């Protein structure tokens, strides 16, 4: 941990794990969307999950390269901005095409967050506390994932409908983005050549990595 970082700098970073759990709303949202659009079969509704989770395969390496260029904190802030925008789309326009766009953007934001958040944790806690902090972060993420379907069900029984979860998630994400943006965090310098496509795919020559 950088000595100049305040002990309170860990708080907005840990809040990022709560935002990370928002992506799991895609499961319950698929059921609600299918009910909202009559005649939608399972194959079509399955596009919602695909549009969300496909991006981890596509963007993990580019996000690592972006993180090397602009820094870990800025990458997390960008991921929050994309997530917040994604959550606003169904509020502005609710049809199946816009739902797909919204969850695709949610997947993009979550991919960037997953790639950048753990490295950012290393800048705000000591090496001795790193494992415990990341474990706590995963617990926070699990709690967020657990609360999502409960909130959606609560809103579904209200005058606002289940879609009210989107502006709530957007507001919480904007709060997380603002909190992290104003929190001073000194990052460790990263070598520009640390993450590249060539170096990443060269790992496939390692038979142990291929097996796993």
Indicate residue ranges for each PLM-predicted region.
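Short hydrophobic/alpha-helical segments at membrane-entry points of transmembrane helices
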Residues: 97-103, 211-212
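Cytoplasmic helix-loop-helix junction between adjacent transmembrane helices
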Residues: 102-139
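Helix-loop-helix hairpin linking two adjacent transmembrane segments in secondary transporters
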Residues: 136-184
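Conserved MFS/SLC helix-loop-helix module at the cytosolic interface between two early adjacent transmembrane helices
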Residues: 58-97
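Residue-level signature of mid-helix packing/kink "hotspots" within the transmembrane helices
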Residues: 24, 52-61, 146
